[in-house]
Amino acid sequence: MASTNDHPGESAAGDPVKLIAVRDSALSVDEVFRALGDDAAGGVALFVGTVRNHDGGADVDALGYSCHPSAEAEMRRVAEKVVAEYPVRALAAVHRVGDLTIGDLAVVVGVSCPHRAEAFDACRKLIDDLKHEVPIWKHQRFSDGTEEWVGAC
């Protein structure tokens, strides 16, 4: 992603979209929470998506995420849409790619807003739209030896 400062994935001063990244290393809830700090915000909402041990009645052993090169740009587009719809003071979203195991963090998103109801609503919109609009794919491997690709995480 093109950045206007020396820290890739981070925004320029004044931009409520503080952190957008796709990473092949472990994610940090603390990093996302720190990015959401704003003295005018009374509510901060976070969503942390983890790798679960089952899907559709089948036992999951592991999974991998892959993405299109445009994934970060699409994440930013989704983030800007949320910022336009809600009174967001700060927003951050980070998604993992590569091989993950049960319990690993797959995605961490969050928003800060003046009030809690707005923060909850904006965070839900952010994760739902990321899931449906950003070109990130999940490759699940099941304990019975089968596997499945799931489009747009």
Write out the residue ranges for each language-model feature:
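N-terminal, polar/charged subdomain of small-to-medium soluble alpha/beta proteins
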Residues: 1-106, 114-124, 128-153
